[in-house]
């Protein structure tokens, strides 16, 4: 769990913002949302494979767009 030290004369909202940012970097909220409901292993593999395919397609489309030159 992320821990922050509140500095002298630091407003509460600034400290809270720092804490939220550290939680986001640690990935706590994403982990909680992922574990909120049980996901079967086959569903998890299927979702991960679909995400990998989507990443690859996005990467290839970026590379192809870079190569096309319209003069």
From Swiss-Prot:
UniProt keyword list: Ribonucleoprotein, Ribosomal protein
Record GO biological process: translation
Keyword Ribonucleoprotein: yes
InterPro entries documented for this protein: Ribosomal_bS21, Ribosomal_bS21_CS, Ribosomal_bS21_sf
Domain of life assignment: Bacteria
One annotated GO molecular function: structural constituent of ribosome
Translocase found in the keyword field: no
Family as reported in the entry's similarity comment: Belongs to the bacterial ribosomal protein bS21 family.
HAMAP family in alphabetical order: Ribosomal_bS21 (MF_00358)
Protein name per the record: Small ribosomal subunit protein bS21
Provenance organism: Shewanella sediminis (strain HAW-EB3)
Lineage of producing organism: Bacteria, Pseudomonadati, Pseudomonadota, Gammaproteobacteria, Alteromonadales
């Amino acid at each position: 769990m992320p821990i922050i030290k509140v500095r002298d004369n630091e407003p509460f909202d600034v400290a809270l913002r720092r804490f939220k940012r550290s939680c986001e970097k640690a990935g706590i909220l994403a982990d909680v949302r992922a574990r909120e409901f049980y996901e079967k292993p086959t569903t998890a593999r299927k979702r991960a494979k679909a995400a990998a395919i989507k990443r690859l397609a996005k990467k290839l489309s970026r590379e192809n767009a870079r190569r096309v030159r319209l003069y």
